[in-house]
Amino acid sequence: MQVEILATGDELLTGQVVDTNSPWLMDRLWDLGLMVRRKTLVADDRDDLRAAILETTGRADLVVMSGGMGPTEDDLTSECVAAVLGVPLERHEPSIELLRERFRKFGRTLTPNNEKQAWFPRGAEVIPNRWGSAPGFTVQVGRGRVVCLPGVPVEYRGLCDEWVLPHVRARLGEVPAAGLVKLFAVPESHADHAMRPVMDDAANAGVRFGYRAHWPEVHVKWTVPGPDAAARAARIRERVLGIFGEQVFGEGKDELPDLVVARLAARGERVALGESCTGGMVAELLTSVAGASAVLDLGVVAYANAAKEQVLGVPAALLAAHGAVSEPVARALAEGARRTAGAAWGVGITGIAGPSGGTPEKPVGTVHLAVAGPSGTEAVARAYRGDRDRVRRQAAYEALNLLRLALR
C-alpha cells in the first residue's frame, strides 16, 4: 500500500505552527510495516490544493489529509475535494444536529459559518469527531482514497486511532511484528554502526530498520513481515539488547521519567533533588508522571551560593575552594538534598548553561552531576553542546538516567 500525507494551512508554511501530526502518523504507520512515501505541505489556496489532491491521489493508494476542515473562509478542504471530483457539496444533517447540540452545551447558537463544517462532497463517508466540532470524511479520488481530517492534534490523532489505522490494518490483513528500543546518549551513527551485523543478517528477509534521533535519546526500530514475524522480531530484540546493554533505557512507549518513578515506587524509596543550572527541570520531568508524589520528597533550586549553603548545607569553604560548578559541589548538593529530606536518594546538578559565564577552564556546557544513595555518591562531568535550553535539557535527562542506573 502506497501512503502519502497532505497537510494544508498557511500557518504551516510561515513557521507559525509546526506540523506534529505527520511525524506522529508516520510513526504509527511504520509499526504496520508502511513507510510514508511523500509528505506535501500546501497553503490555503484553491488552485494549489486542487492540484495537490489530484497529484497525491494519482500516486498513492491512501492520502491522509489534515487541515482546512473548520468554519472560516480559508478552510477549503471539502470544497477543493468536491471540485476535483466534479460533484457538489451536500449538507449532512446528522453532523448539523451534533453541531447544534455541541453549541447548546456551551450556551452558544450555531452560526452559518459553523454549519460549513457539516457540508461534504457528494458520495463521501463522514467520520464523526467526538474530540471536536469538525467531522472528517473519506472518498475515493481516482486510484487513491483520501481521508480528510481536522488539523487540531488531539482531534487528528483521535480520528487516526479510531478510524484511519483500523482501516489500514484491515486492508493490510497480516500486520508485521515490530520492535523499538530506546538508547540514552548513543550517537545515531554509532548505533547504526553497531547494528550493522543485525541488519546484514536480516537484509534478505524483508526486515526494515529505522532510527529516530531526539537527543539525548536515539530510538532503534524494526518491522518484520511473514508468518513467523513475532519469533524473528523477538530474536532481533535479544541481539539489540545484547549489543547496547545498559545504554537501553526502555522499549516501546517507555519514557525515562516514567521508568525512574516506577523503579523508585517498586523499591518503596524516595528521591530529593538539589538543582542549580537546570532550574527545577528534573523536578518538572518527574512530576509530569502520575504517581510522582509517592517517590519525590523535595526539589530545591539552589541557584545562588548562599542558597546552596543555607538550604542544602553545602560548605562555604567547598564553594570557595572549587567553585560552584565542580564535582565536589555536585556531590554536596546531592548529599544535602538527601539529608535534608531524609530520602533514600539525592540528585545534585551544577553547571554553566550559557550563553555567558564560561571560562577556558570551565567553558559553557560544563555540567557536574551526582547521585547520592545508600551505598555512597557517584558523580560524572559532562561537556554539553548547544544553546542554553539544550544544555539544561540534556543535563536534566542525564540526571534521570544516572538515577535509573543507580536503581538497577
UniProtKB/Swiss-Prot annotation:
Homology family: Belongs to the CinA family.
Disulphide-bonded residues: none
InterPro entries: CinA (IPR050101), CinA-like_C (IPR036653), CinA_C (IPR008136), Competence-induced_CinA (IPR008135), MoaB/Mog-like_dom_sf (IPR036425), MoaB/Mog_dom (IPR001453)
Protein name (database record): CinA-like protein
Xref: Gene3D superfamilies: CinA-like, MoaB/Mog-like domain
Pfam assignment, any one: CinA
Domain of life of the organism encoding this protein: Bacteria
